[in-house]
């Protein structure tokens, strides 16, 4: 940038001492130093902002590349699953045609899903309804809390009774 050596700085200082005078030179030097510091901070902020924008643009490019790769993988998986499903259906269709179709325990090819089995098993959805359905003797036997206390209330309840502490000033 600007090539300032020791000799050039000494020359600038001597000229400033003659022009400005020895009384105002320290104040002017402080002001110039503060302005140079501000300029350096501003330049550093601009550099940091530019580098952040460049990194952000690179991250955006990486994100789009990653999303494209994920879409390609998803398409490939769906394609393979569809092909395997079709092959399985064709194989099952061929097996049904050769079996004669007189099987009573086949169930019509219905396979229940996990969700249907889960709903049939649980029945109730609400946690409160499930908890309320249990009898009180069962809750007592299995240590299910019926009456919940806060931590502070529990500490107060179980803290041993002590006599009041005396003040330092009494």
UniProtKB/Swiss-Prot annotation:
Keywords on record? Cell inner membrane, Cell membrane, Membrane, Protein transport, Translocation, Transmembrane, Transmembrane helix, Transport
Where mainly located?
Answer: membrane
Database matches in Pfam families: TatA_B_E
A GO BP annotation: protein transport by the Tat complex
Gene Ontology MF terms in the entry: protein transmembrane transporter activity
Where do transmembrane segments lie in this chain? Answer: 1-21
| The keyword Transmembrane helix is assigned to this record | yes
Q: How does it sit in the membrane?
A: Single-pass membrane protein
Q: Name one GO cellular component term.
A: TAT protein transport complex
Q: Where is the protein localized?
A: Cell inner membrane
Q: List the disulfide bonds.
A: none
What the record says about family reads: Belongs to the TatB family.
Subunit structure, per the record?
A: The Tat system comprises two distinct complexes: a TatABC complex, containing multiple copies of TatA, TatB and TatC subunits, and a separate TatA complex, containing only TatA subunits. Substrates initially bind to the TatABC complex, which probably triggers association of the separate TatA complex to form the active translocon.
Chain's role: Part of the twin-arginine translocation (Tat) system that transports large folded proteins containing a characteristic twin-arginine motif in their signal peptide across membranes. Together with TatC, TatB is part of a receptor directly interacting with Tat signal peptides. TatB may form an oligomeric binding site that transiently accommodates folded Tat precursor proteins before their translocation.
Name the chain's protein. Answer: Sec-independent protein translocase protein TatB
Organism the protein comes from: Cupriavidus necator (strain ATCC 17699 / DSM 428 / KCTC 22496 / NCIMB 10442 / H16 / Stanier 337)
């Amino acid at each position: 940038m600007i090539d300032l050596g020791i000799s050039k700085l000494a020359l600038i200082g001597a000229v400033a001492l003659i022009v400005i005078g020895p009384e105002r030179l320290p104040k002017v030097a402080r002001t110039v130093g503060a302005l140079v510091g501000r300029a350096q901070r501003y330049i550093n902020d601009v550099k940091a902002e530019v580098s952040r924008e460049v990194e952000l643009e690179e991250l955006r490019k990486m994100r789009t590349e990653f999303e494209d790769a994920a879409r390609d993988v998803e398409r490939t998986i769906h394609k393979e699953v569809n092909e395997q499903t079709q092959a399985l259906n064709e194989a099952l269709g061929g097996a049904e045609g050769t079996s004669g179709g007189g099987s009573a325990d086949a169930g019509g090819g219905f396979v229940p899903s996990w969700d249907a089995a889960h709903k049939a098993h649980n029945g109730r959805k609400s946690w409160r309804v499930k908890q309320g359905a249990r009898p009180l003797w069962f809750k007592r036997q299995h240590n299910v809390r019926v009456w919940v206390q806060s931590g502070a209330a529990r500490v107060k309840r179980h803290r041993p009774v002590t006599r009041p502490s005396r003040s330092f000033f009494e």
